[in-house]
Amino acid sequence: MPLYFIGLGLYDEKDITLKGLEIAKRCDKVYAEFYTSLMAGTTLEKIEEVIGKKIIVLNREDVEMNFEKIVLPEAKEKEVAFLTAGDPMVATTHAELRIRAKRMGVESYVIHAPSIYSAVAITGLHIYKFGKSATVAYPEGNWFPTSYYDVVKENLERGLHTLLFLDIKAEKGKYMTANEAMELLLKVEEMRGENVFTPNTLVVVLGRAGSLNPTIRAGYVKDMIKEDFGKQPHVLIVPGKLHVVEAEYLVEIAGAPKEILEQFAPRKM
């Protein structure tokens, strides 16, 4: 019997596609995980109401260590759905799960849904100009990750934008804000001193992507770090070289300083 990886979309229970909803409704068993992303506009109960089935929520250990014991044996006998926020295959963990299913002889299918990788276009930045993305992680004990700083540096050297995901500690109900991410990047800058991320760096914050009223703000770190971007989830974007239309969009829609337009010659309207 098949295993269906079904995306729930970005914000609430209405983001699932008709195809995903139809398949989830007919499955014999429905599992889900919410530790890789946050759907701020809904609850488990609302999703269950839409699907019409009880959902078994798995934690990180269940998914990463015990998927073969919990989910895959069921999928050999029944139609099973595995629900995830966003698009199922954006999280590398889910790609690995599909490999495990194949090795255990379980046929699997992917039902796509809205993803942050497409929704980020609402910032006005051109999708084809994004480079490698990275996650800004909370330091823990003696561990202070800095790889995201290197990703920003590499992308800026190529004139590319950087999409930064922000750390999630779902088991603690802790979701990093864009402000915290900027603070961490500034700390790394203090340690490295490579002039990659400074108070004068232009950044874009997107909050609650997929909702009807997302936060879209652009400005310099020294100003943005003090702003309230509302409820999480947030993503932080460090723009690379801007096209004139991108710059105009950031000014008109995201409230960026008009001075970012000074590098461009006046446009003929």
From Swiss-Prot:
UniProtKB keywords: Methyltransferase, S-adenosyl-L-methionine, Transferase
Annotated pathway: Protein modification; peptidyl-diphthamide biosynthesis
GO MF, any single term: diphthine synthase activity
Superkingdom: Archaea
Keyword S-adenosyl-L-methionine applies: yes
InterPro entries (alphabetical): 4pyrrol_Mease, 4pyrrol_Methylase_sf, 4pyrrole_Mease_sub1, 4pyrrole_Mease_sub2, Dphthn_synthase
GO biological process: one example: protein histidyl modification to diphthamide
Ligand binding (S-adenosyl-L-methionine): 10, 87, 90, 115-116, 166, 209, 234
Pfam families named in the record: TP_methylase (PF00590)
Record EC number: 2.1.1.98
Catalytic activity: 2-[(3S)-amino-3-carboxypropyl]-L-histidyl-[translation elongation factor 2] + 3 S-adenosyl-L-methionine = diphthine-[translation elongation factor 2] + 3 S-adenosyl-L-homocysteine + 3 H(+)
Functional description taken from the UniProt entry: S-adenosyl-L-methionine-dependent methyltransferase that catalyzes the trimethylation of the amino group of the modified target histidine residue in translation elongation factor 2 (EF-2), to form an intermediate called diphthine. The three successive methylation reactions represent the second step of diphthamide biosynthesis.
Family under the similarity heading: Belongs to the diphthine synthase family.
Subunit structure and binding partners: Homodimer.
Designated name of the protein: Diphthine synthase
Protein's organism: Pyrococcus furiosus (strain ATCC 43587 / DSM 3638 / JCM 8422 / Vc1)
Name of the gene encoding the protein in the UniProt record: dphB
